């Protein structure tokens, strides 16, 4: 029986199968696209974009109804990769006691607002993404028009938001004052700082051991996970941070939101012929996370794989389950 998924102005209908239990065999997925670092990595970035475009075409061929939202994702990624070529951010100073708190008390290494941002690059990327958003869907186009009318030719307000760091409550307050859709405004701002955030993650990567954290929140910035990934022949399970994109190890049989390990109350389902994309349900807290098992997925981008299976999120929602960190692309 087909399921029609509506995400903003995008609609797709696909057949869905069901399953119960947990997977006990898997093979390694490819890592997400790493950020380009400096001018010498320009060609690496281009190769990554070519692979992304190829995968997008594969998904569009299989699921034509996702064409418009996938085109939007591709345009955003291309703009972000272009921004990386001239990115300049400060180094992140770390105090010795921070790592002690990380290991002994379970605090994250930094907070979201601690990521240094290239303000000028973020402002320019925001303006570019507004242009891209005009062709995304009617609601996005309307919100972009309101944003441009509010900001006008003066970048002061926008620059101030970036200078204050990522403070979601402050951003939501500004969105309300400007009578904007919070989700659209947050999406545009977060997508604009993404290159800076990824550069910050690269700075701190050597300070963390992703194999030993085993907690339900990101060891780097403290944010909740947006996706679950299965890697390596033994099927190690990793969580993907909803904010910074860092990946860390977690238990295979576990709800990452309520820590439930009872197999009887943990189950999953997947789309017909799409066993590599699963919805892991917890009957204790009635929340879910999407899991990407890249057994047959070459050079996979987890966010893209998530975006191409929004129909599964709709089915989970219909059954009364919530996703704590929903895909930001459903605007």
Place the predicted regions along the sequence by residue.
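Short Gly/Ser/Thr- and charged-rich N-terminal loops/segments
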Residues: 5-23, 33-40
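Compact recognition or signaling/catalytic modules
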Residues: 18, 294, 330-331
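Cys/His-clustered metal-coordination modules, chiefly Zn-binding fingers
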Residues: 199-316
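C-terminal membrane-proximal segments flanking the terminal transmembrane helix
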Residues: 312-329
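N-terminal alpha-helical interaction blocks
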Residues: 49-205
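Serine residues within intrinsically disordered or low-complexity segments
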Residues: 26-30
């Amino acid at each position: 029986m087909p399921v029609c998924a509506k995400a903003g102005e995008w609609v797709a209908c696909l057949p869905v199968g069901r399953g119960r239990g947990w997977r006990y065999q898997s093979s390694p997925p490819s890592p997400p696209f790493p950020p380009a670092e400096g001018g010498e990595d320009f060609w690496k970035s281009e190769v990554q974009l070519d692979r992304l475009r190829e995968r997008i075409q594969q998904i569009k061929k299989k699921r034509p109804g996702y064409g418009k939202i996938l085109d939007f994702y591709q345009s955003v990624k291309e703009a972000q990769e272009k921004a990386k070529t001239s990115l300049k951010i400060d180094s992140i100073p770390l105090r010795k006691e921070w790592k002690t708190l990380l290991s002994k008390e379970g605090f994250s290494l930094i907070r979201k607002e601690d990521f240094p941002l290239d303000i000028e690059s973020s402002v320019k990327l925001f303006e570019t993404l507004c242009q891209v958003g005009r062709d995304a869907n009617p609601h996005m186009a309307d919100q972009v028009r309101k944003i441009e009318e509010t900001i006008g030719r003066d970048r002061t307000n926008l620059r101030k938001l970036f200078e204050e760091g990522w403070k979601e409550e402050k951003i939501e307050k500004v969105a309300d004052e400007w009578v904007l859709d919070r989700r659209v405004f947050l999406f545009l701002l977060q997508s604009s700082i993404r290159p800076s955030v990824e550069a910050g993650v690269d700075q701190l990567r050597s300070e963390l051991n992703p194999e030993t954290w085993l907690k339900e929140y990101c060891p780097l910035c403290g944010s909740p996970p947006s996706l679950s990934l299965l890697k390596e022949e033994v099927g190690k399970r990793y969580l993907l941070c909803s904010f910074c994109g860092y990946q860390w190890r977690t238990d295979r049989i576990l709800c990452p939101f309520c820590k439930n390990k009872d197999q009887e109350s943990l189950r999953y389902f997947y789309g017909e012929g799409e066993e590599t994309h699963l919805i892991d349900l917890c009957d204790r807290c009635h929340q879910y996370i999407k899991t990407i098992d890249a057994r047959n997925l070459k050079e996979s981008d987890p966010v893209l794989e998530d975006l191409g299976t929004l129909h599964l999120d709709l089915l989970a929602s219909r059954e009364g389950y919530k996703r704590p960190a929903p895909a930001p692309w459903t605007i």
